[in-house]
Structure formats: C-alpha cells, structure tokens
Swiss-Prot record:
Annotated segments matching region Disordered: 1-23, 63-96
GO MF term set: DNA-binding transcription factor activity, RNA polymerase II-specific; RNA polymerase II cis-regulatory region sequence-specific DNA binding; zinc ion binding
Protein name, entry field: Uncharacterized transcriptional regulatory protein C25B8.11
Protein species of origin: Schizosaccharomyces pombe (strain 972 / ATCC 24843)
Localization: Cytoplasm; Nucleus
A family per Pfam: Zn_clus
DNA-binding region (UniProt annotation): 25-54
GO biological process: DNA-templated transcription; regulation of transcription by RNA polymerase II
Length: 654
C-alpha cells in the first residue's frame, strides 16, 4: 500500500487529518467524491480501490479564486490553467490547436483562420460557427452531474427505487443541494414538492472495468489519429457541422469545436468516431474534401457499434450522442442490432433523467437546452423505427414531460440556419402525431379492437388526416437543409394512413382519385431529389419510405390492372420511380438501395404470373448496368475485434 502514497516535497509538510473535509486528495476532488482516510499515513479508500497514487498527504496546491464568468462565456482570454490538457503538452496534438486559433470576437469564415493544407496543397477551411477563444471548455458549469467525462454513474432516484428518497430528503443534511455519504453523492436538481428530482453519483469502483474502458478509449483514439491526419480531421468536423448539425443539433457545437481545437483527444473517442462516420457520408459531395475517403464508412460504423456496446456499461452524455449519430446515419444491415442500440439508448436516457422537464432545475441553461434536444431526437428515432420495424414503441405518452423546443431556443455563440433548425422542430411535431397514430391504430389491442368496429377506426383516420394537414409546413421561402427529407416524412405518414384505410376497406376511403393524388405527390417529391441533393440532410427513415412506396406502386398496378386509366398510371409511376432510384444511386445517394433491391425482387417474383413486370425489371436493370441487378446487391460487412486496432486494415488517404 505504501507505493500508493506520494512522498511530500522537501519544503512541505503533511496536512493534518482534520483538514480532510476542506481539502480532499486531488483524485477525489476531480471526481467530486468524498475523500475517506481511515488512518493517518494511508491513502484514501477511492485511490486504494482504483490503485492510483493518493495526494492526500501532500501539501495542497494553492488555488487562485477565479473571477465569476458569465454563464460559460467570458470576454477574457482563457488562462493557461483553464485550457491546458495532457494533449496540449504533447507536440503531436499541439499543432492542431495552433492551426485552429480563432480570431477573437469574429466568426471564422471558410476561407480564413486556417493554415492546414491537404496532401495536394489545397487549403482546408474550418468553420468554427462563431466559436472564439473566449469560450471556456473547462468551465465546470455545464457538467455538474458528471454526464460527460466524469468517472461517476449519475442516475435519477425514482419514487419506487430501492433508495428511500423520502428518508434522504427529510433526514439527510444537504449543503447547496448536495449530500455526500458512504462514498456516494446525492444532488438535488429540483426541490418541487410535486416532482422532486435527485441524482445519485456513484463512483466507478470497478477497477478492471475502468482499466478496460481507458484502454479501449486510448486504442480508438490511436486508431483514429493513425488513419485521419490533422487536415482530414478538420475537414470531417467541418462536413458534420455544415451538413448535419444545422438540422440535427444534438451536440453543444461551441464546446465541441473548442474542445477539438485544443486537441482531438479532448473529445470522447466514441463520439469522435461516430461524428467522423457521419461526416464520411458527405465526403464525395463536398468541395472541401479531396481524394478518396480516408476510411471505409461501413467499417467505421461497425467499430462505432462495437464501441457503443462497450460504452453502454459506463455511460456518459457522449455515449447517448454517439448512439444518436449511429441511429440517423448507420446503413441498415441488421434490424436486431439497430433495435438493440435504440432500446438501450432510450432506457439510458431515462436513467439519466432526460425524460423529465428540466425547466426549473438548478442546472445551467445550456444543459437544459441540450437535454431537450437530445430527448426529442431519441423520441423521433423511437417512433419512426417502431413504425418501419413494426415493433412496439419504447416511449409512451405518460413516460415523459419534456416541453417542446422553441424556435428561438439556442446556445451561446451558436450560429445555425433558422430554417434548418425549424425542420428539426417540425420533425418533432410530426413524430408526436406519429406517436398517436401508432398508439391508437397499431398496438396489439388496438388492432383487435378495430377489427370489430370499422367505423371507429374510420373516425380516427379522418382526425389524423386533419391533424396532418394542419401541421404540414408551407413551402420554405429559402433553401434549408432537411427540407426535402421533411417532405418525404410527411408523405410517409400520409401513405401510412391510406394503407391502413385500404387494409380495413373503409367506406370513407374508396376514392381512387384521392389515393392516386397522394401517391403521385409522393413520387413527385421524390423525383425532385437530384444528384446534387447528396449533400443535403436526410433522415434515415427515407430509405424505408422509398421501399414502402415501391411495394405500394406495384400493388396499385395489380389492383387496377383491369382499369386502363389507374393501372397505366400506377405502372408509369413505378417505371419512373425505379429509374430515378437507379439514377440517384449512381450519384452516391445510398438511401435508395433498399428500394432498388425491393423492386428487383418483387418484379422478379410477380413477373412469373405477370410477364410485363418481368420485362420491366429486365429493361430497367440491364439497360443501366452491364452487371444487372448484381450491381445493387448488399455487400457483407467485415467484423472487427475492438481490442485489436491493428487488424482494422483501412487504406490510408493519399
């Protein structure tokens, strides 16, 4: 045990044991944990269990009280103490910080403030989105609950949990809303008598597990730094904040960018890997990227999936954010794996209290904003994957009380397109409608009930059509990211209602004209997507919609094949739709892959009894590629051992 105690300096003396309450050891202080020393001369319990040196008996380092800052943003330049990290002292990572220096008080444009150049000598622009050196990444205000890089497990004490919250509230002494006992810390964030909320921060005492976690984190960082150089990393971060973040703002952009500026290892490895993976989608379509992609995106997503499976055992805020990036960009290859990630992310968010209304909590406003955005992003994923997988939802109406996000609710120093942000808000509104549709029409009990009463379901569908039309947005006057995808998602809900009406053969929905108007509008919105749209933000559920639309077009053609008018219209729409899918696929728009494979298999099977469908299939696929349908076959993905990064054989960028 003696090797765990640091020897005091020659000019210092040991601190008296009675000073423990006012000055814990450095490790306990950083972890905000109670420093317990059973006897003088021994290390504290936490350092003993973690097998790390204890500084309790060293002379305390003199602390200079800093001036109060304005809610994480100051007009002063950050001091060296607030910006220095282990990576800053490493020359390998210092270069990145030097090249990302911001012009104080100004927004860095894509053509200034960067000295990094790519392999071909082209300058790599950096869009810091309004971030300057005034922003303090080490400001402790944002992460008082240990949701990010802390070694604590924060979770909400629910009213029925084994911890007696009434006993704790009435008989324990809280100082500034915090009470520490038995190496655990309980923190009040809401003292409301109706819905009090307490967090418990339980130190991570699993020594071997923590060692594995640290080893994995360093290994993944080493892998990323090996295959993604400084200029490429800057480009990928730029692509993410240019193409994804405006319509999907789940990251604290200012804090992330300045953390990345101070060294890529300041960003949790799983979040950085997920962000790089998302950004690779836009590598071919953005003029700021050059050459071949530095990594294979599908292999990167496999790594992220393996990493999430590990990080879920020691979750942080970055774990949820990485999972959300996985859920919006991961190409569908395994429904079970994706459903598992979604379910665990949902439960984890509830464990950390994201389903509560944090408006009156005693936490920084920035954290309130991020919490709301993350919860609604999880809500969106839960509803849409539930719809297309045909599974029960993980989130029910009574499970959350999170208010909607206001259109002017932004973070300090955050600069984003208001139109793109509104597409995110409108998607939340549409997903709320989808929740009611799934709950009222598609639960097991609802399906049983409606099979006996068609009139009831007819009234409900009419009501849902009315609500859908009332929230459908008018045309945006200015172009914005996510607009095309938002139109597709509205079409998807409308088609879902029509398919339900057809399934129950409801008398109020027998007009073929109205049905074809809906389908033609969906195909028209799809055809408006061009090869240049590959740089736009699309929700991943668009791929399911395209596949569903193919099936519906074939069904309509067969249902009306004796009708020269409707049968011919459906056949013409099917022909145009599949050909446009192939055109987009050749331009790198991979959301149509599922629809192409679905159309090929359906036309082949149904062509046995309907030769004209087989002729259509042969004409479409053989005329576009000499390999025929084999050109669109799914390529099996390679699996990797996350503990052996050297086996991940990615080609380095030239």
């Amino acid at each position: 045990m003696s090797n765990l105690i640091l020897t005091p300096s020659n000019n210092g003396t040991e601190r008296p044991y009675r000073s423990r309450k006012t000055r814990p050891c450095d490790n306990c202080r950083l972890r905000k944990s109670r420093c317990v020393v059973e006897s003088i001369g021994n290390p504290c319990l936490l350092c003993t269990q973690l097998k790390i040196p204890c500084t309790y008996h060293l002379p305390p380092i003199k602390r200079n009280k800093q001036k109060k800052q304005q809610d994480s943003v100051s007009d002063d330049t950050p001091s060296e103490a607030t910006t220095t990290t282990n990576d800053d002292r490493d020359p390998k990572y210092n270069a990145l910080g030097n090249n990302l220096d911001a012009v104080r008080g100004k927004v860095i444009s894509p053509t200034q403030g960067s000295d990094a150049r790519g392999p071909d000598g082209r300058q790599v622009p950096l869009n810091l989105a309004g971030i300057t050196e005034m922003y303090h990444t080490s400001d402790d205000k944002f992460d008082k609950l240990g949701l990010d890089d802390s070694l604590n497990y924060p979770y909400v004490l629910g009213p029925t949990c084994d911890s007696d919250i009434d006993l704790i509230r009435e008989y324990f002494s809280f100082e500034n809303g915090v009470c520490s006992f038995d190496n655990m810390t309980v923190k009040y964030v809401s003292t409301s008598s109706k819905s009090p909320v307490m967090y418990i921060l339980d130190p991570a005492y699993e020594n071997d597990r923590h060692s594995d976690f640290s080893r994995y984190d360093h290994a993944l960082h080493d892998l990323l730094s090996t295959y993604i150089d400084e200029a490429t990393g800057r480009t990928l971060v730029n692509l993410y904040f240019s193409h994804v973040h405006p319509s999907y703002p789940i990251l604290h952009g200012p804090r992330f960018l300045l953390s990345y500026k101070n060294g890529s290892r300041n960003v949790p490895s799983i979040l950085l890997a997920a962000l790089y993976s998302v950004a690779l989608t836009y590598w071919p379509s953005d003029s700021r990227s050059f050459g071949a992609p530095p990594l294979d995106q599908r292999k990167m997503w496999t790594i992220v999936e393996e990493g999430l499976n590990f990080h879920f055992t020691q979750p942080r805020l970055s774990t949820i954010q990485a999972a959300l990036l996985y859920l919006i960009s991961r190409p569908l290859h395994n429904m079970y794996s994706l459903s598992s990630i979604l379910s665990r992310t949902t439960v984890l968010s509830q464990l950390l209290g994201f389903n509560h209304d944090c408006t009156e909590w005693k936490i920084p406003n920035e954290e309130k904003t991020i919490r709301k955005r993350i919860w609604w992003a999880i809500f969106i994923a839960d509803k849409w994957y539930s719809m297309y997988f045909g599974l029960a939802t993980n989130i029910h109406e009574d499970d959350f009380v999170v208010p909607k996000i206001e259109s002017d609710e932004s973070l300090p120093l955050e600069i984003t397109s208001s139109h793109s942000f509104k597409t995110f808000l409108k998607m939340i509104e549409l997903s709320s409608l989808l929740q009611d549709i799934l709950q009222d029409l598609f639960t097991v009990r609802a399906l049983t009930r409606h099979s006996k009463n068609n009139r009831s379901i007819s009234y409900q569908i009419i009501g849902f059509f009315t609500r859908l039309n009332s929230i459908r947005p008018v045309e945006f006057t200015e172009p914005a990211l996510g607009v095309a995808s938002l139109k597709i998602q509205f079409d998807a809900v409308e088609i879902l209602l029509w398919k339900t009406a057809l399934r129950f053969n409801l008398p109020d929905f027998q007009s073929a004209d109205d049905l074809f108007v809906c389908v033609e509008k969906s195909v028209s919105n799809f055809v408006q997507i061009t090869a240049n749209s590959s740089g736009d933000f699309f929700w991943p559920y668009a791929g399911f919609h395209f596949s569903t639309l193919v099936s519906l077009l074939i069904r309509l053609h067969l249902d009306f094949h004796t009708n020269n008018t409707y049968g011919a219209r459906a056949f013409s729409l099917l022909d145009a739709f599949v050909r446009h899918c192939i055109t987009l696929h050749e331009a790198g728009f991979d959301f149509v892959e599922m629809a192409i494979r679905r159309s090929s298999s359906l036309l082949k099977e149904l062509g046995k009894d309907h030769p004209h469908l087989l002729a259509l299939r042969d004409d479409i696929f053989n005329s576009n590629d000499s390999r025929g349908e084999e050109a669109y076959n799914h390529v099996p993905e390679q699996l990797f051992d996350p503990w052996n990064p050297h086996s991940w054989t990615f080609p380095k960028s030239d």
